[in-house]
Design a protein with these regions (language model features):
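Active-site beta-loop-alpha junctions enriched in small/polar residues
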Residues: 10, 15-19, 38-41, 70-72, ...
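Acidic-and-aromatic substrate-binding clefts and catalytic sites of carbohydrate-active enzymes
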Residues: 41-49, 75-80
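Conserved, mostly hydrophobic/aromatic
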Residues: 12, 37, 65, 106, ...
Length: 159
């Protein structure tokens, strides 16, 4: 089925794939893929997070990795804070650069739990932008906060 999807120009969201399925998908489809809500296993060893090799494969094909705010995917003890968010961003930037990262918060899967320092009564998008602006250049934050996803969609989903 994946090879047929590739023939039709359909890209994949690899966020919920097992490691084996991830590599098989990349073998069967030459298209860029997106991990809409995944973090980095090197920072938090959870099987839903991407290995460094997976992240590099996504970036090498022009794909995008959406950073997830679920505490259990940010920190191995499940109690995350804004420093954990920054650790994943730092790792992603050093590994794949700022053109392969995006927001992919997956807040509907958090059961109402957010990283400490994130106020659920305010715009989460705006709060994370503020957090990133405290550490990274505006151009990097703009890419992560939306430009990268827009470019991916223009190049792969919108005809």
């Amino acid at each position: 089925m994946i090879d047929r999807m590739a023939e039709m120009g359909i890209t994949l969201d690899v966020s919920h794939l097992s490691d084996q399925a991830f590599y098989e998908a990349f073998e069967l489809s030459p298209l860029p893929h997106i991990a809409t809500h995944s973090n980095f296993r090197a920072v938090c060893d959870h099987d839903r997070n991407l290995t460094d090799n997976m992240a590099k494969m996504i970036a090498a094909r022009g794909g995008v990795i959406g950073l997830n705010l679920c505490p259990r995917f940010l920190s191995e003890d499940g109690y995350a804070d804004t420093d954990d968010i920054l650790r994943h961003v730092d790792h992603g930037l050093s590994l794949v650069g700022d053109r392969a990262l995006a927001f992919g918060f997956d807040i509907d899967g958090t059961d109402g739990e957010y990283p400490m320092g994130i106020d659920a009564t305010r715009s989460i998008h705006d709060q994370v932008i503020e957090l990133l602006l405290s550490k990274y250049p505006v151009s990097t934050v703009e890419r992560i906060a939306g430009e990268n996803v827009i470019e991916f969609l223009k190049g792969n989903l919108i005809s």
